Structures are given as C-alpha cells and as structure tokens.
Amino acid sequence: MPAQLLDGKVMAAELEEELKKRVEALKEKGYTPGLTVILVGDDPASQTYVSNKEKACARLGIRSRTLRMPADTTQETLEAAIREANADPSVNGILVQLPLPRHLDGDRALSLILPEKDVDGFHDINAGRLSRGLDCVVACTPKGALHMLKRAGIPISGKEAVVVGRSNIVGKPMALLLLQENATVTICHSRTVDLASHTGRADILVAAIGKPRFITADMVKDGAVVVDVGINRVDGKLCGDVDFEPVSQKASYITPVPGGVGKMTIAMLMDNTVAAAEKAAAAL
C-alpha cells in the first residue's frame, strides 16, 4: 500500500492561518512584526528564496525589508548592516541569506546577530540552548520537519529515529529535537559503515545529505516514516535525497520533494519571526 503523503503545502497553509491571527493580535496592540533579510550578491537560488520569504511576509502582514548588497561587499559593511538591524527596535528578526560570497566570513557574521533576533536559529547560543533542551530559536528546517510529524499525529516517543546527515543546519538540530521527543536517535554520515543496517531499522528516517535519490527502497523498512529534507536538481527537475517512487511503496508516510519540508521551512521562519515579535512586545 502506497505511503500517505505528508503534504507541506497544506500544513504550511494551515500554519499561516494561525500566524495571521497572531500577527493581527499584535497589531491590535500597536505592534507590527518586522523581518530584515540581508542578501549579498546575485545567486539565482538565493534570489528565489528571498523572494519567497518576502511573499510570505506580505501574506501574513509582517513588515519585510531586504538589504540587497553587491557581491564585492566587504566584511565590515556586512557587519555594519547587522549591527544596524540589531539596534533597530522595529526589527524582530534578522536573516543573512546563505551562502555568502567566499571572501566573507559567514560564521562571524551570524555570530553578530542578537540571539533573540536570530530567526534562522543558527547562532551558537541558540544551538547551545537547543542541546541543553532550553527555550531557544530553533532552526527552521528541522523545526518544520518535526511539526509535520506532530501535525500528522505520528508517534515519536520510544521510536527508532535515524538521521542521515550531520550538518549544523539540519542534521544535528533534527537529532536533538527527536531526542527531546524521547526517540532513540542515531546519526549517520559519510563515514558511517554499513549505512543500510542503520536506516533499515528506522521507524522514522530523516534524509538530509544533499545527494539525489540516495536513500533507496532496500534501505528502508516496511512501514517507516520517511522525511526527505534534500532539495536537488537533476535534469532540470527537483528531487530529494530519497528515491521517492519505490520508497513510497514501502513507507507508511513520506514527504514529497517539492511540496514537503521545503514549504515548512519558510512557514517556520515566519513562526520564529512572530514569536520574536511577541516576546519583544511583551517586554515593552
């Protein structure tokens, strides 16, 4: 029996309806959430991502400002823009669109963002608080993936969860979130020996490695929940890290690419921005 689709479009639209109400409640108190996006250079994919974020802000009534900076922007100029946004009380969220041009130090730039305005959840303080199970801003993609599992009513506690990928942006925070939900978590990566022996026992399998259709049906056990975080372009078409058609015949639930976790990532960016605005408004 084919797997049930975890539809990111539907779930993101549902979340946006909830966020609209929260934004309206803030505006009734005279407070409008604000997001500043810093885009350096003219990378086409980054331009698309930023455009999608601007559209999401417009739908929800969030004030959006994009600082478009040339590719030869200096580190000093980038850092000055971040400090200016930090100091602006009308800005609740700051996002530096990655990747940055190679001559720029992205880690240093991200470390300058105030943790409470770090709506991407990449700041070392937010990452550290997540590892301790403390209140923090959570990275949007793993937060979105977890939201999809919970929204679908999929049990997590006590389940075997395997995360393939150990990036700071997805793999590590995903593993920590699943651990907080009382799953038994294994992280696999490029040096894992006999990967299929690990993925084959997963009740929940998260693929976040950036290799098109890498997870094949023989690596997945019957009835597994498969979350595909990958976004790859092959022959002009988008695909994930999972070989979707054959795997969907074995899994109980699966996220599609496109239309899966990617849709939730932007929705969670909006959620983080609204939450930051709510905290700022409460402190006035």
What is each of the regions a protein language model found here?
Residues C57-A71, V185-I187:
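Short beta-strand elements in bilobed, periplasmic/extracellular small-molecule ligand-binding domains
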Residues M1-Y31:
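Positively charged, low-complexity intrinsically disordered leader regions
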